[in-house]
């Protein structure tokens, strides 16, 4: 080989080695340039690396109340500014990576109404699923409808906000497992077992707050949980009574979520989760998503609540259950009682700053903002696939206390000659 060629090769090799060394050093230097005490930049780094997924937002119900689910007439400026807590610019400012939209419909106004009182709740729930999905479709440049955790991760990689649906109360499906199944097929991926009323499956926390006994889960409850486990639908224990929490955790085969609840030991409100349940949630591999409602997080002095109150709840749950079992579920647009510093969805980066300032590592913060709930959702799906592969069929059990002729009256269709008419002319 000619001397000049050897010289050029040597120079090229030396340059390559130098560049290789430089590339191995620069990222380390770039990371090191963010001081540990620069919590804003560290929070930004967390939110770039993990999707911030909120467990509960009531914007679809706010749309129903304000526009009767009309979103195409120009009266819902979601892309610019809405009066409530949530719109697209504020979601972007809040660095949100995913949102469980609640397709909420209220319990009957009479707290003493029979559980099987005929209502329009199931119809209205389908309308809320419809408007939520139409909203996501309308703003598909920024939002992506997802019904599985893989899609949620893909949305984050594409710079979109994953949008998922949750039903807030078993009354919304008429205490019917078949109706629940259809809601799942329509895209709902969690159901809160009760809202502020008992149903055929469990006792609500609001019932106990009203001075009535905590009867926990009903005899029909295990059938519901069995079907939700089979489907791969997240079991949400926010709003249920403390005994209902304990009973359901005994029968579920999959991790549970609390979509918007905080720590009972910090604030003695029955909507919060007691320590013994937090420990069981850890064994169950579930997640408690901390809510921001002032009267929940400081029952004694709600006016004093600020972002540090929420940090206190987060750290208590992390201490009792572990950092693998805590998340965020603000309840934006479902309450007017929000902490100072967390007035709308744009404030999430500030919360993460405060969590880091209080001593959490960035790894712990990533778990908090979204990795935990995605892990739970993934495990719920894996368990469902295993159950389905075992040959488990859809649950057909019907609540014995239900009204309605077709299922509550026995006919001779199977046992003897069919009648000439079934009364369905």
UniProtKB/Swiss-Prot annotation:
Its cofactor is Zn(2+). It comes from the Eukaryota. Coiled coil: none annotated. Gene3D superfamilies: Metal-dependent hydrolases. The keyword Protein transport does not apply. GO terms for molecular function: metal ion binding; metallodipeptidase activity. It catalyses: an L-aminoacyl-L-amino acid + H2O = 2 an L-alpha-amino acid. The keyword Hydrolase applies. Residues 1-31 form the signal peptide. Hydrolyzes a wide range of dipeptides. Belongs to the metallo-dependent hydrolases superfamily. Peptidase M19 family. This is Putative dipeptidase MGYG_00085. It comes from Arthroderma gypseum (strain ATCC MYA-4604 / CBS 118893) (Microsporum gypseum).
